[in-house]
Design a protein with these regions (language model features):
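N-terminal helicase ATP-binding lobe
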Residues: 1-216, 220-341, 347-352, 356-372, ...
C-alpha cells in the first residue's frame, strides 16, 4: 500500500484510451486525498481500492452514539475504523456506553488507550461510576491510577507501555475492541517521547490483530498515513469475497468516518504583542473567565504573577502532581475553573474538559492547527455560547529564531550520525543522547 505520499495527476495529452503525457501537480497525503474528494449524489462513500481504504465523507455534525448504535457496530469485522469528529461530539460517551454495553453483553473485553494520564483517569472514573461504583469508594486517587480493569475495559495511558510488565499483561489477553483515543498524540508527542511509534505499533501488533481497531481523533492529519500503513501490516492476506450477485467485494482494511465540523461559536482574534493581550485580560470583567495556553513554564509563571494569585492559577505537567494536585483533581472532577484565569501548558491539550458557562475567553500561544483545535476543544460549549479565541501570530523575527533553532538541531543530529557511522571511540559520557543518560 502506498501510504506516504499520493499524487494528483493532470492529464495533458490523451489519444484514444492511451495517456501520452502526465504532469504531477502535487504530492498528497491520505488526509489531503480525502479532502480532495468531490461530493457524490449517488453514494456517501468512496473506495481507494489500491490502498484498501473506504471513506465516508458526508456525515453532518451530530453525536457519535446516534450514528453508531450497537446494532450497527455489531456488524463490524476485525478491521480498522477511524472516527474523525470535533471535540464535544460524544466520542468518549460512545466508548463508555455503547461499546462497553456491547462488551458486557458478549462477555468480552476491550482495551482502551489514551495519550494523557488525565484522560485515562477521566475514563476510569466514568467506567467505574457506570459499572463498578464500589471502586470509587474503595480506592484512593493513587489506587485508581494503578487499577486498570474497569467494567469491560482495560484502561491504560500510552506512557505505561514503557514497562515490559504492562506489555506482557495485554499480550496475555484476547480483546474484542482496541480503542486508541486522541490517536494523533502518538505522533504529536514524539517530540518529547521517542518511543511513541514503537508503542503504537506494538499495541496494534500484539493486542489488535484479532480485534476491531478503533481510532478516535478530531485532528487526523498527522497520524492518518501511519494508521493506514500499520493496518496493512497487521491485516491478514486478503481472501476474495463476493456479494449475492457474484460481484467481488472490495478489499477494505480501513474505514474512515469523517463528520462535519462547526466552529460557528468561535470569534477569532489574532495578536502579536503579548503585552497588549495581557492588558486586555487585566481589565476583563470579573463575570468572565479565561483559559490560557502558554508556551513554557516560565511564561506561565510570569502571567500568573502579572494577573495576581487571587485571579489566576498556573498548572503544568509537574505541579499538577505536587502543589497543585488538589486543584487539578477538582478540575477533573467538577470541570469548572476555580479562579478567573486558568493558565496551563500543552499538557492539558487533551483529557481535561471545562463545562463552565463563565469561560468566555481562550488564549493560545500556539499556532499549529492540531494545537488550536485540541486546545480550543477543552472548552465545551452549550446552546448559543460564543467564545473569543485569541491566537498569537508569531512575528517574522520570532519565526527566524525558531528556524535557527531547527537548523542547529538538524546540524547536531548530523554530527551525531557521523559519530555513530564512523564508530568513534569515546568515553560513555560523551555519547550523544539518547545513547547516554546521566543517572543521579
Amino acid at each position: 500500500m502506498a501510504t506516504g505520499n499520493y499524487f494528483y495527476r493532470k492529464i495533458l495529452e490523451r489519444k484514444g484510451n492511451y495517456t501520452l503525457k502526465v504532469k504531477i501537480l502535487k504530492k498528497m497525503t491520505l488526509n489531503e486525498r480525502i479532502d480532495y474528494l468531490q461530493p457524490d449524489i449517488y453514494r456517501i462513500f468512496k473506495d481507494f481500492t489500491n490502498e484498501h481504504v473506504r471513506v465516508y465523507n458526508a456525515f453532518a455534525k451530530q453525536y457519535i452514539s446516534n450514528m453508531f448504535p450497537k446494532d450497527k457496530v455489531k456488524k463490524w469485522t476485525n478491521d480498522g475504523y477511524v472516527i474523525i469528529a470535533q471535540t464535544g461530539t460524544g466520542k468518549s460517551t460512545w466508548v463508555t456506553r455503547t461499546i462497553a454495553e456491547m462488551l458486557l453483553e458478549d462477555r468480552a473485553t476491550g482495551l482502551l488507550i489514551t495519550p494523557r494520564v488525565a484522560l485515562t483517569m477521566q475514563y476510569k472514573r466514568e467506567l467505574a461510576k457506570l459499572y463498578c461504583p464500589e471502586l470509587l469508594e474503595e480506592l484512593t486517587e493513587q489506587g485508581i491510577h494503578k487499577q486498570h480493569e474497569y467494567g469491560p475495559f482495560d484502561v491504560y495511558s500510552l506512557q505505561e507501555f514503557l514497562s515490559a510488565a504492562k506489555v506482557r499483561a495485554i499480550k496475555s489477553k484476547r480483546y474484542e475492541f482496541v480503542i486508541l483515543d486522541e490517536v494523533h498524540a502518538f505522533v504529536g508527542d514524539a517530540a518529547f517521547n521517542p518511543f511513541t511509534e514503537k508503542i503504537f505499533r506494538l499495541l496494534l501488533q500484539e493486542a489488535g490483530r484479532q480485534a476491531k481497531r478503533v481510532y478516535l481523533t478530531a485532528t487526523p492529519e498527522i497520524i492518518l498515513d501511519e494508521i493506514a500503513q500499520v493496518e496493512e501490516e497487521i491485516t491478514p492476506e486478503f481472501i476474495p469475497r463476493y456479494d449475492s450477485l457474484g460481484w467481488p467485494k472490495p478489499n477494505i482494511r480501513l474505514t474512515i468516518f469523517r463528520f462535519a465540523r462547526d466552529y460557528g461559536y468561535v470569534q477569532p482574534i489574532f495578536f502579536q504583542a503579548e503585552e497588549e493581550i495581557l492588558g486586555k485580560m487585566e481589565s476583563l470583567s470579573g463575570e468572565k473567565r479565561g483559559l490560557i495556553f502558554v508556551r513554557s513554564v516560565k511564561q506561565g509563571l510570569e502571567w500568573q504573577a502579572k494577573l495576581g494569585d487571587q485571579r489566576a492559577v498556573f498548572m503544568n505537567a509537574q505541579n499538577k502532581r505536587t502543589e497543585r494536585e488538589d486543584e487539578f483533581n477538582e478540575l477533573l472532577r467538577y470541570q469548572k475553573i476555580d479562579k478567573q484565569f486558568l493558565i496551563v501548558t500543552r499538557f492539558m491539550d487533551v483529557g481535561v474538559n471545562v463545562h463552565d458557562l463563565q469561560l468566555k475567553v481562550v488564549i493560545l500561544f500556539h499556532a499549529f492547527p492540531e494545537d488550536v483545535v485540541q486546545m480550543l476543544g477543552r472548552k465545551r460549549v452549550a446552546g448559543n455560547e460564543v467564545v473569543q479565541l485569541y491566537i498569537e501570530i508569531p512575528s517574522i523575527g520570532a519565526l527566524k529564531q525558531e528556524v535557527g533553532k531547527l537548523e542547529n538541531a538538524e546540524a547536531e543530529i548530523g554530527r551525531n550520525r557521523e559519530l555513530l557511522k564512523n564508530r568513534v571511540i569515546m568515553g560513555i559520557s560523551e555519547l550523544p543522547h539518547p545513547f547516554y543518560m546521566q543517572m543521579t
